[in-house]
C-alpha cells in the first residue's frame, strides 16, 4: 500500500465489559486485548487504527460523522444496537464508508430478536460467532478491500 489507510474500530454498548460479561457468549478476552491485537496488526500492515467504544448511541453516531472523509474503512460491532438502531445505520450510509459488521457470538444461535440486523444488508460483510478472532478476520478483509481500491 502506497498510502497509510485509516480504519475506525467501533464497539457499541456493554462491550467495555468483555471478559466479565457473559463469557459463555462473549468469551473471556477483554476489549482492551482485542484492541491491542488489532493495533499490532495495524502496525504490521502500516495502517492507522482508531479504537472507540461507547455505550451511547449518540456518541457512536457522532464518531461516525467525524469520520467522514477521514477514515477509509470501519470495523463495527454495534452490539445491542444491531437490532434496534436505524439511526446508526443511517449514519453509516450518510458517510459512505465501507464497513464490516462484527459479532463475537453467533447471533443466529441465540434469541430470535437477535437474528435481525439493521446493518447486514448495507455492510461489505458480516462476521459472527468466531469470538475475538472475528475482529482479526474483519481487519484482514479490510486490508484486502483497501488494496483493491
UniProtKB/Swiss-Prot annotation:
The keyword Metal-binding does not apply. GO terms for biological process: amino acid biosynthetic process; aromatic amino acid family biosynthetic process; chorismate biosynthetic process; quinate catabolic process. Substrate binds at residues 77, 83, 90, 104-105, 114. Its EC number is 4.2.1.10. Keywords: Amino-acid biosynthesis, Aromatic amino acid biosynthesis, Lyase. One of its GO terms (molecular function) is 3-dehydroquinate dehydratase activity. It is an enzyme of class 4 (lyase). InterPro entries: DHquinase_II, DHquinase_II_CS, DHquinase_II_sf. CDD domains: DHQase_II. Gene3D superfamilies: Dehydroquinase, class II. It catalyses: 3-dehydroquinate = 3-dehydroshikimate + H2O. The record marks 21 as: Transition state stabilizer. HAMAP family: AroQ. PANTHER family: CATABOLIC 3-DEHYDROQUINASE (PTHR21272:SF3). Homododecamer. This is 3-dehydroquinate dehydratase. The gene is aroQ.
Amino acid at each position: 500500500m502506497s498510502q497509510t489507510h485509516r480504519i475506525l474500530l467501533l464497539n457499541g454498548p456493554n462491550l467495555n465489559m468483555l471478559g466479565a460479561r457473559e463469557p459463555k457468549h462473549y468469551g473471556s478476552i477483554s476489549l482492551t486485548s482485542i484492541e491491542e491485537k488489532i493495533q499490532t496488526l495495524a502496525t504490521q500492515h502500516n495502517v492507522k487504527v482508531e479504537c472507540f467504544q461507547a455505550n451511547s448511541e449518540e456518541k457512536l453516531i457522532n464518531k461516525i460523522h467525524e469520520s467522514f472523509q477521514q477514515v477509509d474503512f470501519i470495523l463495527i460491532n454495534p452490539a445491542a444496537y444491531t437490532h434496534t438502531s436505524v439511526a446508526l445505520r443511517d449514519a453509516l450510509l450518510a458517510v459512505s464508508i465501507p464497513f464490516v459488521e462484527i459479532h463475537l457470538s453467533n447471533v443466529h444461535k441465540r434469541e430470535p430478536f437477535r437474528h435481525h440486523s439493521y446493518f447486514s444488508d448495507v455492510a461489505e460483510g458480516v462476521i459472527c460467532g468466531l469470538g475475538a478472532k472475528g475482529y482479526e478476520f474483519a481487519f484482514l478483509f479490510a486490508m484486502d478491500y483497501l488494496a483493491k481500491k
